[in-house]
Amino acid sequence: MRLRKKWWARPEIEASDKFAEEPKELRGKWNKEFNNNNDIHLELGCGRGGFISQLVEKNKDINYVGIDLKDEVIVYAIRKVKEKEEEVKREFKNIRFVTMNIMGIAEVFDKNEISKIYINFCNPWPKEKHNKRRLTHTKLLTEYKKFLKPNTEIWFKTDDKELFEDSQEYFKESGFNIEYITYDLHNSDFKENIKTEYETKFETMGMKIMFLKARLL
Protein backbone atom coordinates (compact mmCIF):
# COMPACT_ATOMS: atom_id res chain seq x y z
CA MET A 1 0.00 0.00 0.00
CA ARG A 2 1.42 3.37 -1.03
CA LEU A 3 1.50 6.11 1.57
CA ARG A 4 -0.21 9.33 0.61
CA LYS A 5 2.27 12.19 0.40
CA LYS A 6 2.19 14.34 3.52
CA TRP A 7 3.74 17.66 2.57
CA TRP A 8 3.97 18.76 6.19
CA ALA A 9 6.10 15.73 7.17
CA ARG A 10 9.44 16.99 5.82
CA PRO A 11 9.41 20.37 7.60
CA GLU A 12 8.41 18.66 10.84
CA ILE A 13 11.19 16.07 10.80
CA GLU A 14 13.78 18.66 9.75
CA ALA A 15 12.82 20.72 12.80
CA SER A 16 13.67 17.79 15.10
CA ASP A 17 17.14 17.38 16.61
CA LYS A 18 16.57 13.63 16.32
CA PHE A 19 16.62 13.70 12.52
CA ALA A 20 19.89 13.25 10.63
CA GLU A 21 19.23 15.16 7.42
CA GLU A 22 22.56 14.40 5.71
CA PRO A 23 23.49 10.91 6.96
CA LYS A 24 26.25 10.35 4.39
CA GLU A 25 28.16 13.23 5.96
CA LEU A 26 28.10 11.35 9.28
CA ARG A 27 29.81 8.23 7.89
CA GLY A 28 32.57 7.39 10.35
CA LYS A 29 31.42 10.21 12.63
CA TRP A 30 28.30 8.82 14.28
CA ASN A 31 29.84 8.69 17.75
CA LYS A 32 30.70 12.36 17.37
CA GLU A 33 27.07 13.00 16.42
CA PHE A 34 25.98 11.32 19.66
CA ASN A 35 28.82 12.96 21.61
CA ASN A 36 29.92 9.66 23.16
CA ASN A 37 31.68 6.40 22.31
CA ASN A 38 28.79 4.09 23.12
CA ASP A 39 27.77 1.22 20.85
CA ILE A 40 25.42 2.08 18.00
CA HIS A 41 22.48 -0.18 17.12
CA LEU A 42 20.33 0.07 13.98
CA GLU A 43 16.70 -0.71 13.34
CA LEU A 44 16.18 -1.21 9.61
CA GLY A 45 12.61 -0.38 8.66
CA CYS A 46 11.75 1.27 11.97
CA GLY A 47 8.18 2.13 10.97
CA ARG A 48 6.34 4.39 13.39
CA GLY A 49 8.88 3.93 16.14
CA GLY A 50 7.05 1.71 18.60
CA PHE A 51 9.96 -0.71 18.91
CA ILE A 52 12.94 1.64 18.88
CA SER A 53 11.32 4.08 21.32
CA GLN A 54 11.18 1.27 23.89
CA LEU A 55 14.83 0.39 23.30
CA VAL A 56 15.93 4.00 23.72
CA GLU A 57 14.08 4.27 27.02
CA LYS A 58 15.52 1.03 28.40
CA ASN A 59 19.14 1.50 27.30
CA LYS A 60 20.61 4.93 28.04
CA ASP A 61 24.14 3.78 27.22
CA ILE A 62 23.40 2.57 23.70
CA ASN A 63 22.93 4.85 20.70
CA TYR A 64 20.18 4.02 18.20
CA VAL A 65 19.58 4.90 14.57
CA GLY A 66 16.16 4.16 13.08
CA ILE A 67 15.95 4.00 9.29
CA ASP A 68 12.92 4.01 7.03
CA LEU A 69 12.23 4.96 3.44
CA LYS A 70 9.55 7.62 3.82
CA ASP A 71 9.29 10.97 5.60
CA GLU A 72 5.63 10.05 6.13
CA VAL A 73 6.74 7.17 8.36
CA ILE A 74 9.70 8.78 10.14
CA VAL A 75 7.58 11.74 11.22
CA TYR A 76 5.45 9.41 13.34
CA ALA A 77 8.53 7.67 14.75
CA ILE A 78 9.88 11.03 15.92
CA ARG A 79 6.51 11.85 17.47
CA LYS A 80 6.51 8.46 19.22
CA VAL A 81 9.89 9.19 20.81
CA LYS A 82 8.65 12.61 21.93
CA GLU A 83 5.61 10.98 23.52
CA LYS A 84 7.88 8.55 25.34
CA GLU A 85 10.07 11.43 26.55
CA GLU A 86 7.02 13.20 27.96
CA GLU A 87 5.84 9.96 29.57
CA VAL A 88 9.11 9.32 31.43
CA LYS A 89 10.01 13.02 31.82
CA ARG A 90 13.46 12.52 30.30
CA GLU A 91 15.06 13.64 27.05
CA PHE A 92 16.49 10.87 24.88
CA LYS A 93 19.78 12.05 23.41
CA ASN A 94 20.72 8.59 22.13
CA ILE A 95 18.42 8.37 19.09
CA ARG A 96 18.57 9.58 15.50
CA PHE A 97 16.32 8.88 12.54
CA VAL A 98 17.26 8.67 8.87
CA THR A 99 15.09 8.68 5.76
CA MET A 100 16.77 6.64 3.04
CA ASN A 101 16.69 3.58 0.80
CA ILE A 102 18.49 0.86 2.75
CA MET A 103 20.12 -0.37 -0.47
CA GLY A 104 22.60 2.50 -0.02
CA ILE A 105 23.28 1.92 3.65
CA ALA A 106 27.03 1.27 3.32
CA GLU A 107 27.41 4.91 2.26
CA VAL A 108 26.13 6.01 5.67
CA PHE A 109 28.13 3.85 8.10
CA ASP A 110 31.87 3.12 8.15
CA LYS A 111 33.86 -0.01 9.04
CA ASN A 112 33.21 -1.31 12.59
CA GLU A 113 30.77 1.52 13.30
CA ILE A 114 27.70 -0.59 14.14
CA SER A 115 27.31 -3.14 16.96
CA LYS A 116 23.85 -4.62 16.31
CA ILE A 117 21.01 -4.66 13.78
CA TYR A 118 17.29 -5.23 14.30
CA ILE A 119 15.07 -6.21 11.35
CA ASN A 120 11.38 -6.48 12.24
CA PHE A 121 8.59 -7.54 9.88
CA CYS A 122 10.24 -6.31 6.69
CA ASN A 123 8.58 -6.62 3.30
CA PRO A 124 8.82 -10.33 2.31
CA TRP A 125 9.04 -9.57 -1.42
CA PRO A 126 7.60 -13.01 -2.32
CA LYS A 127 8.17 -12.81 -6.10
CA GLU A 128 11.50 -14.40 -6.99
CA LYS A 129 12.52 -11.47 -9.20
CA HIS A 130 12.14 -9.18 -6.16
CA ASN A 131 13.95 -11.40 -3.60
CA LYS A 132 17.10 -9.25 -3.70
CA ARG A 133 15.11 -6.42 -2.13
CA ARG A 134 14.64 -8.41 1.08
CA LEU A 135 16.48 -6.82 4.00
CA THR A 136 17.92 -10.24 4.89
CA HIS A 137 19.07 -11.15 1.38
CA THR A 138 22.73 -12.03 0.89
CA LYS A 139 23.12 -8.92 -1.26
CA LEU A 140 22.25 -6.68 1.69
CA LEU A 141 23.94 -8.83 4.31
CA THR A 142 27.15 -8.27 2.33
CA GLU A 143 26.55 -4.52 2.60
CA TYR A 144 25.92 -4.71 6.36
CA LYS A 145 29.19 -6.58 6.86
CA LYS A 146 31.06 -3.54 5.57
CA PHE A 147 30.20 -1.60 8.74
CA LEU A 148 29.42 -4.24 11.37
CA LYS A 149 31.87 -4.92 14.18
CA PRO A 150 33.18 -8.50 14.49
CA ASN A 151 30.91 -10.83 16.47
CA THR A 152 27.88 -8.62 15.78
CA GLU A 153 24.32 -9.90 16.13
CA ILE A 154 21.38 -9.36 13.80
CA TRP A 155 17.95 -9.96 15.36
CA PHE A 156 15.25 -10.80 12.84
CA LYS A 157 11.48 -11.16 13.35
CA THR A 158 8.77 -11.97 10.83
CA ASP A 159 5.35 -13.55 10.43
CA ASP A 160 6.24 -14.84 6.94
CA LYS A 161 7.44 -18.46 6.99
CA GLU A 162 8.87 -18.47 3.46
CA LEU A 163 10.91 -15.35 4.17
CA PHE A 164 12.05 -16.79 7.50
CA GLU A 165 13.28 -20.04 5.99
CA ASP A 166 14.94 -18.34 3.03
CA SER A 167 16.61 -15.90 5.44
CA GLN A 168 18.19 -18.75 7.38
CA GLU A 169 20.01 -19.73 4.21
CA TYR A 170 20.94 -16.13 3.46
CA PHE A 171 22.57 -15.75 6.87
CA LYS A 172 24.50 -19.01 6.58
CA GLU A 173 25.71 -18.18 3.06
CA SER A 174 26.86 -14.75 4.26
CA GLY A 175 29.05 -15.95 7.13
CA PHE A 176 26.62 -15.66 10.03
CA ASN A 177 25.95 -18.34 12.64
CA ILE A 178 22.32 -18.74 13.74
CA GLU A 179 22.55 -18.89 17.53
CA TYR A 180 18.87 -18.87 18.42
CA ILE A 181 15.77 -19.69 16.41
CA THR A 182 12.09 -20.18 17.13
CA TYR A 183 8.99 -20.51 14.99
CA ASP A 184 6.77 -19.38 17.88
CA LEU A 185 8.43 -16.51 19.71
CA HIS A 186 5.64 -15.74 22.14
CA ASN A 187 5.60 -19.32 23.40
CA SER A 188 9.38 -19.70 23.48
CA ASP A 189 11.95 -19.36 26.26
CA PHE A 190 13.27 -16.09 24.81
CA LYS A 191 12.77 -13.38 27.44
CA GLU A 192 14.30 -10.30 25.82
CA ASN A 193 11.58 -9.67 23.27
CA ILE A 194 10.16 -6.19 22.75
CA LYS A 195 6.96 -6.14 20.72
CA THR A 196 6.45 -3.97 17.66
CA GLU A 197 3.11 -2.49 16.61
CA TYR A 198 2.71 -5.18 13.95
CA GLU A 199 3.59 -7.89 16.42
CA THR A 200 0.89 -6.86 18.89
CA LYS A 201 -1.64 -6.81 16.06
CA PHE A 202 -0.57 -10.24 14.78
CA GLU A 203 -0.70 -11.67 18.30
CA THR A 204 -4.36 -10.68 18.67
CA MET A 205 -5.02 -12.49 15.38
CA GLY A 206 -3.42 -15.67 16.72
CA MET A 207 -0.51 -15.56 14.28
CA LYS A 208 2.84 -17.10 15.21
CA ILE A 209 5.91 -14.87 15.16
CA MET A 210 9.23 -16.31 14.01
CA PHE A 211 12.53 -15.03 15.36
CA LEU A 212 16.24 -15.68 15.03
CA LYS A 213 19.54 -14.27 16.24
CA ALA A 214 22.43 -14.50 13.79
CA ARG A 215 26.02 -13.68 14.74
CA LEU A 216 28.68 -12.53 12.30
CA LEU A 217 31.58 -14.97 12.44
Curated annotation (Swiss-Prot):
Gene3D superfamilies: Vaccinia Virus protein VP39. It comes from Clostridium botulinum (strain Okra / Type B1). S-adenosyl-L-methionine binds at residues 43, 68, 101, 123. It catalyses: guanosine(46) in tRNA + S-adenosyl-L-methionine = N(7)-methylguanosine(46) in tRNA + S-adenosyl-L-homocysteine. Pathway: tRNA modification; N(7)-methylguanine-tRNA biosynthesis. The gene is trmB. Its EC number is 2.1.1.33. Residues 129-134 are annotated as: Interaction with RNA. Keywords: Methyltransferase, S-adenosyl-L-methionine, Transferase, tRNA processing. This is tRNA (guanine-N(7)-)-methyltransferase.
